[in-house]
């Protein structure tokens, strides 16, 4: 029997599980605070359990609208099995559906190879004030 994997937007009853997944590495805000600021969260379920999530925000301040990926986190026991790549593939599909141009992410140096493996390109340019890390972009191919 094929394992059950499902990616969907988060629901209210997911937030305790999402907090467990993300709180080790990210500052956590519950959904009601996030959605007011234009944030959306996707969750990845495997065999009925939420094992991963990502937080995105629409970037409309640019003349070329895109998504900003603020976090992508998978439970430690479920890493290196392709689940993060599945979440990224879902985001890429969302970009195409919404007629956006791509996905921006800022990450630590050790994560650059992971994002490059998923077709993100390192952006060379001005450093965003107050933001540490490296900026990468995935561009939708037209």
Spans of model-derived segments:
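Short amphipathic alpha-helix that is part of the acyltransferase structural core
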Residues: 1-31, 45
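Short loop/turn motifs at secondary-structure junctions and domain boundaries
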Residues: 32-38
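Conserved beta-strand in the GNAT
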Residues: 43, 49-58, 65-68, 73
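A conserved beta-turn-beta hairpin within the catalytic core of GNAT-like acetyltransferases
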Residues: 59-70, 79, 129-132
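Conserved acetyl-CoA-binding loop-helix of GNAT-fold acetyltransferases
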Residues: 74, 80-93, 117
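Residue-level recognition of the GNAT/N-acetyltransferase active site
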Residues: 75, 108
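Conserved GNAT acetyl-CoA-binding A-motif
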Residues: 95-107
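Conserved catalytic-core motifs of GNAT/GCN5-like acyltransferases
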Residues: 106, 121-137
């Amino acid at each position: 029997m094929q394992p059950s994997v499902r990616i969907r937007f988060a629901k209210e009853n997911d937030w305790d599980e999402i907090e467990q997944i993300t709180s080790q590495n990210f500052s956590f805000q519950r959904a009601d605070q996030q959605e007011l600021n234009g944030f959306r969260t996707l969750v990845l379920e495997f065999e009925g359990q939420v094992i991963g999530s990502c937080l995105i925000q629409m970037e409309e301040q640019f003349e070329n609208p895109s998504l900003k990926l603020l976090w992508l986190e998978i439970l430690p026991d479920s890493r290196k099995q392709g689940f993060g790549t599945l979440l990224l593939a879902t985001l890429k599909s969302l970009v195409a559906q919404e007629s956006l141009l791509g996905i921006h992410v800022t990450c630590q140096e050790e994560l650059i190879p992971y994002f490059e493996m998923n077709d993100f390109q390192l952006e060379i340019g001005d450093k965003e004030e107050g933001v540490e890390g490296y900026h990468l972009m995935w561009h939708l191919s037209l």
